[in-house]
Amino acid sequence: MKITIFGAGAIGGYLAAKLAIAGRTDLSIVARGAHLEAIQANGLRLIEDGEESMAPVRAAAKAEELGAQDYVVLALKAHSLTPALDQIAPLLGDHTSVVTMQNGVPWWYFHGVGGPLEGTRLNAVDPGGAIWQRIGPQRVIGSVVYPAVEVDAPGLIRHVEGKRFSLGEPSGERSERVTLLAEEMVKAGLQAPVRDDIRSEIWVKLWGNLSFNPISALTGSTLAAIVADEGTRALARTMMLEAQAIGESLGVRFPIGVDRRIKGAGDVGEHKTSMLQDLERGRPMEIDALVSAVQELGRLVDKPTPTIDAVLALVRRLAVERGCYS
């Protein structure tokens, strides 16, 4: 089984290290800069459960060096996907499956859903439908990523908690390709449940991200602080209820209530969201996949999003001023 991880940051690096240590797959990664140089020189190092391991990994700067794969795991952020299409193309053969590990609403959301929205492209995450055309939704295996992982230094990945990567076909079927991939991930020491409704699981994670991420960026607050404050907690709750109405109109099942989801966010503690961290570091922010796409879905199903609209306008303006959004 030939697998390439495209985007070997924290999550991509962790998955690559686990698969490489297991030694059951023909594994490669596409990386760049100091990270690539460190991996080529010293292997990919992983700190997990207090112990450090070294995984010998084939690392390349260009996908042309690797050729067509059985699976390509896209572990880069959603806004980085369109600019990377030319680099990804050499990895795609006639039977290559593509595993999407981005946060937020996926570009393939309306593939295989049936009904009047079947085949709808979402401009917020796939401007002009370029990803849909170049990669093709028929290749996709969806996923929801839960591990907390950090890059401590070039070539050094530190696992904090969590080992679950939920997988699912857009159609909901338990196909051979998703089953085989899940088996390899489990044998590598990961949890890889195969879901028959991956969209609903995507929504449950998105539910918190679309509210807490922009509020955190706007206020400079941690999850615990947002939940502890009556005003920001109410703001997050209103955004989540607007999103829930959109999701349910699309057939999404929310297995928990909004207040339980908010409590879960608060229990994470003094954690800065990824959007706040990106703002502080001057990096591009995941505004479109986490928030703009939900607004776009609301328009498609005729559900009002006044609170989401207001928060989106504010966080987008802030990001533009800081050079973190264009």
From Swiss-Prot:
GO terms for biological process: pantothenate biosynthetic process. InterPro entries: 6-PGluconate_DH-like_C_sf (IPR008927), 6PGD_dom2 (IPR013328), KPA_reductase (IPR013752), KPR-Related (IPR051402), KPR_N (IPR013332), NAD(P)-bd_dom_sf (IPR036291). One of its GO terms (molecular function) is 2-dehydropantoate 2-reductase activity. It comes from Mesorhizobium japonicum (strain LMG 29417 / CECT 9101 / MAFF 303099). This is 2-dehydropantoate 2-reductase. Pfam families: ApbA, ApbA_C. Substrate binds at N103, N209, N213, S274. Keywords: Cytoplasm, NADP, Oxidoreductase, Pantothenate biosynthesis. Pathway: Cofactor biosynthesis; (R)-pantothenate biosynthesis; (R)-pantoate from 3-methyl-2-oxobutanoate: step 2/2. The lineage of its organism: Bacteria, Pseudomonadati, Pseudomonadota, Alphaproteobacteria, Hyphomicrobiales. NADP(+) binds at G7, A8, G9, A10, I11, G12, N103, E286.
